[in-house]
Amino acid sequence: EACYNAGTFCGIKPGLCCSAICLSFVCISFDF
């Protein structure tokens, strides 16, 4: 299953963000 890009809603399946963290139901990239 594909992971979510930053800015993608992740409230239902958190932890699928691509090199990002699920924060406030949205994938937030921590790759600055």
Swiss-Prot record:
Domain of life: Eukaryota
Summary of the tissues where the protein is detected: Expressed by the venom duct.
InterPro entries: Conotoxin_d-typ_CS (IPR012322), Conotoxin_omega-typ_CS (IPR012321)
One Gene Ontology cellular component: extracellular region
Annotated localization: Secreted
Swiss-Prot/TrEMBL keywords: Disulfide bond, Hydroxylation, Ion channel impairing toxin, Knottin, Neurotoxin, Presynaptic neurotoxin, Secreted, Toxin, Voltage-gated sodium channel impairing toxin
Record-level Gene Ontology MF annotations: sodium channel inhibitor activity; toxin activity
Main location: secreted
Keyword Endoplasmic reticulum applies: no
Disulfide bonds: 3-18, 10-22, 17-27
PROSITE patterns, per database record: DELTA_CONOTOXIN
Stated family: Belongs to the conotoxin O1 superfamily.
Domain notes for this protein: The presence of a 'disulfide through disulfide knot' structurally defines this protein as a knottin. The cysteine framework is VI/VII (C-C-CC-C-C).
Function of the molecule: Delta-conotoxins bind to site 6 of voltage-gated sodium channels (Nav) and inhibit the inactivation process.
Stated name of the protein: Delta-conotoxin-like MVID
Organism name: Conus magus
